[in-house]
Amino acid sequence: MTRAYGRVVAVLLITASACATIGTHAAEKKEDPRKAVIERSRVWSPTDIASKDLKTGPTGPGAFQFRETVTCKYLDKKLSGNSPKFACVIGEDDEVKVKFGGNNGEVYGEVLATRLLWALGFSADRMYPVNVICKGCPEEFLGIERPNDESRFDPAVIERKMDGHEWGNKGWSWKELDQIEGERAAPRAHRDALKLLAVFMQHSDSKPQQQRIVCESKAKWPDPSTCDDPFLMISDLGLTFGRATRSNANEPSGVNFKAWAEMPVWKGDEKCVGNLPKSFSGTLSEPEISEAGRKFLADLLMQLSDRQLTDLFEAGRVRLRLRSPGVVDSGFATSADWVDAFKAKRDQIVQRRCA
């Protein structure tokens, strides 16, 4: 009986130990490295703002000149999102995404917002305003028909992704910015500056899929769970420079001069709470901004010259967009009108104190 009892106890102990080991391994396997990556992410890099040519935009491989004519072959491929867009192939294998349509606010907003982020050091995808000649595009796209099964799209923009590799496929939520910590990570001043810039631009559609975690290293890493240099960036900025709306509607939210010019940067006269209404899918609304974040963004914005601001709105071709889209007799705002509105809103940030 004693030996039998001993064997039973031994078996039970071994079983318990094995279960504990399996449980530990299971917990290790379930551990998501995502939090660790976000905790040490950056959102801003030092840059020479005065040297930025906002009309030309980012140069280098894959860049296009302002309003360059680009010929491509239509690629029948489903793209995410609701705005007019299509995939197209330049040459043999250079696949690009084309956003198009004079009534599509994202055609203008993408250029304005990405150029501004790029100039200030927050990084973004590269968006180029071009004239696209598409071979084989469907008639329902309503391009201007040309001979040889070609159609022209103007205004249009071509997207080039930010250098690096996307980490994961979930994007990031604005609430996750508050998880960042550590010496290599973005300080609160940088994070609050990015939040305030999103308020300034009225970034309406802020769901996680509109932001990406990018590993800036050009070489692919062997272990997809690691990333030595994570950077949090905003990847879809079409619904900006209007007024953030519950439904992320194109006309009020995407480059609407009247709505943007009339929207105060701050909510109320005392606390530093950004005036950004929450959209149905958004993860950023009415953020509280620190004095360090306000000052950091103010110092960056003040480095932009009037020439650069004019170039920004010329690149965005704002003269093609009604002051109040949907209101046909609202007329068209000039680049000078937009520059004045930009500077007035910038002054609201510069003159505020959040201490």
Model regions and ranges:
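Short regulatory "switch" loops immediately downstream of catalytic or recognition motifs
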Residues: C134-C137, I213-K220, V318
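C-terminal catalytic region of ATP-dependent kinase domains
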Residues: A219-A355
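Sequence contexts marking disulfide-bonded cysteines in secreted/extracellular proteins
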Residues: A20, K73, V89, P138, ...
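Regulatory N- and C-terminal appendages and interdomain linkers associated
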Residues: V11-L12, A16-D76, E92, A315-A355
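Sec-exported extracytoplasmic/periplasmic mature domains
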Residues: W118-F122, V199-Q202, D347, C354
